[in-house]
């Protein structure tokens, strides 16, 4: 890969210099490690059952049900088996250069208040996973996917499927402390030598008046806190915000004057975009031509997308994952070409699931022949004309 931004991280004297790079001329091509540090039961029910959490809505309810010690053991077993070193070898062999790792604020265990229920012991496994990525030369985005109080309503990706309660000064402070802690880890652990981006918050509420303080208070505080832990003279981490296309306001509007090394993320799931006609031709056309970078938000990366159509058609003949592999291969190519043209690259949601459905699994899509083992081969695809 050519023309990387190469950042020499200032590590302790006992650690080797590490290099975190951000693809520039070569697109970011990657996957999410969904389900690793934040379990979403809908996409991994058999694993959830193995953990003893069957019937529970989220991590909070599972920990509360099992009790802390039993839950800690169950989650630590999960963290040790869901993503393994061989997964990163496969990613590298498939031409992927990036992983986005969703994490919850409870990984910094002193942020968890009495009456909150989350598993303990995750940091050891996060370091291990980042080390495996680094061994394969894979760039890492660390994301605050689940924030204190939950940033979205009734969604397991927040760790607690409840009414969004993140939008308070107290929880903003905890969220800021968490992303600063993540940033500090990257300078003090050799395993994190290819971590180059901190995502400050996944999928906040959109089109809601609560988010005004997200933009005016939380975003600038998070930016300043991350910059404050960076060593002087070192190249800075990229700090990533949900772009304005998400609908939570303009993230850069309240950042400090002269802010640097900021990137933006877009999530693009056509299955939930009711403005797009549900036809194969329209899905291909839209994927080829949709501009995913808002004005003033360069670079933007499409950090979540899939091959899943709307729920009401996904099992019909015209959208069957069994009989329509040719279409799904073309749609995969169209999205890749579109995201690499209108943005700076992408990370697919997700690497693996237990759904038995390659439309939600990059690993499964490669096995099914829908995603190629050589991504460069898509350059010759004529799907977008």
State what each model feature region is.
Residues 190, 197, 201-340:
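Extracellular glycoside hydrolase catalytic/binding regions
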Residues 318-322, 327-334, 338-385:
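Aromatic-rich peripheral "rim/lid" segments of glycoside hydrolase catalytic domains that contact
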Residues 39-120, 346:
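Active-site-adjacent substrate/metal-binding segments within catalytic domains
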Residues 29-33, 99-101, 140-144, 198, ...:
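Hydrophobic faces of well-ordered beta-strands that scaffold small-molecule active sites
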Residues 16-41:
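N-terminal module-boundary/linker segments of secreted carbohydrate-active enzymes
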Residues 73-99, 113-146, 157-197, 225:
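An active-site-proximal structural segment forming one wall of the substrate-binding cleft
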Residues 1-21:
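Fungal secretory targeting signals
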Residues 135-137, 233, 342:
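Helix C-cap/helix->beta junction micro-motif
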């Amino acid at each position: 890969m050519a023309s990387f931004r190469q950042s020499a991280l200032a590590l302790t004297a006992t650690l080797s210099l590490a290099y975190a790079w951000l693809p520039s001329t070569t697109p970011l091509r990657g996957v999410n490690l969904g389900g690793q540090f934040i379990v979403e039961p809908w996409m991994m029910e058999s694993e959830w059952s193995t953990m003893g959490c069957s019937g529970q809505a989220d991590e909070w309810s599972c920990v509360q049900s099992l009790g802390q010690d039993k839950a800690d053991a169950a989650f630590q077993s999960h963290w040790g088996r869901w993503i393994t070193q061989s997964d990163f070898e496969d990613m590298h062999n498939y031409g992927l250069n990036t992983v986005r790792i969703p994490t919850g604020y409870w990984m910094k265990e002193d942020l968890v208040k009495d009456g909150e229920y989350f598993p303990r012991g995750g940091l050891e496994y996060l370091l291990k996973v980042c080390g495996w990525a680094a061994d394969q030369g894979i760039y890492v985005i660390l994301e605050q996917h689940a924030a204190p109080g939950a940033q979205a309503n009734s969604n397991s990706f927040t760790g607690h499927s409840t009414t969004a309660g993140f939008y308070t000064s107290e929880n903003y402070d905890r969220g800021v402390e968490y992303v600063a802690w993540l940033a500090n880890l990257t300078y003090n652990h050799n395993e994190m030598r290819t971590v180059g981006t901190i995502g400050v918050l996944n999928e906040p509420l959109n089109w809601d008046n609560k988010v005004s303080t997200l933009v005016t208070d939380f975003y600038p505080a998070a930016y300043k806190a991350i910059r404050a832990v960076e060593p002087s003279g070192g190249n800075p981490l990229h700090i990533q915000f949900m772009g304005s296309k998400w609908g939570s306001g303009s993230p850069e509007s309240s950042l400090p004057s002269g802010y640097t090394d900021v990137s933006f993320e877009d999530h693009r799931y056509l299955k939930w975009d009711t403005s797009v006609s549900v036809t194969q031709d329209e899905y291909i056309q839209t994927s080829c031509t949709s501009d995913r970078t808002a004005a003033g938000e360069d670079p933007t990366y499409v950090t979540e997308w899939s091959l899943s159509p709307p729920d009401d058609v996904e099992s019909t003949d015209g959208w069957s994952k069994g009989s329509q592999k040719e279409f799904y291969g073309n749609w995969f190519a169209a999205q890749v070409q579109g995201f690499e043209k209108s943005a700076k690259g992408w990370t697919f949601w997700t690497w693996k699931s237990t759904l038995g459905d390659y439309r939600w699994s990059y690993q499964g899509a490669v096995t099914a022949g829908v995603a190629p083992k050589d991504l460069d081969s898509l350059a010759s695809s004529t799907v977008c004309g």
